[in-house]
Amino acid sequence: MPTPHQLLERFAGIKLAVLGDVICDRFIYGDVQRISPEAPVPVMRAQQEELKAGGAANVAHNALTLGASVHLFGIVGEDSWGESLRKLLAGLGLHTEGVLPVAQRRTTLKTRLMAGSQHLLRVDEGVTESISAEMENALLASLRAAVPSCDALVLSDYDKGVLTPRLAVQATKLFRDAEKPVICDPKPANIPRFV
């Protein structure tokens, strides 16, 4: 049986396609020194803000950190969060040509308020409705072009509407027809679309 180190060595150099729900994780760090007089809630003084890759983008970043070359495919809105996230992802070294900006959709944003090590609150923004057939087709065209240069596909489902049943089936077919493995990480309620 290979050791963990041997497994990591095998992972280095793999070329992955990651398709799924691209999320912008926003962290606001601060400190709490009092309770609000308006309601029994803490008042946090914001001191620092940080954006991180979330959802499928986090999966892609983790694979990149382990030594893989990663092509990310997903949807962001044509908004400031989408633009900031695409810049962040490109700066990390991910191939982001497959992260498509779409005017009809807001970027999925999860804002976490952190006081020290205490997670005070999370605010989620964005839509969870399934993407349109037009968006599915655009992602499939982008993914199809990447199949020859990728060794495997990871489907990363966070139930934000990108991995529709049709897109999951068609993306899987592209890689299976090329005799390349497909790895699925679905939300439990969505498992039937990946079987």
Language-model features and meaning:
Residues M1-Q33, Q48-A56, A60-V195:
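Ribokinase/PfkB-type carbohydrate-kinase core domain
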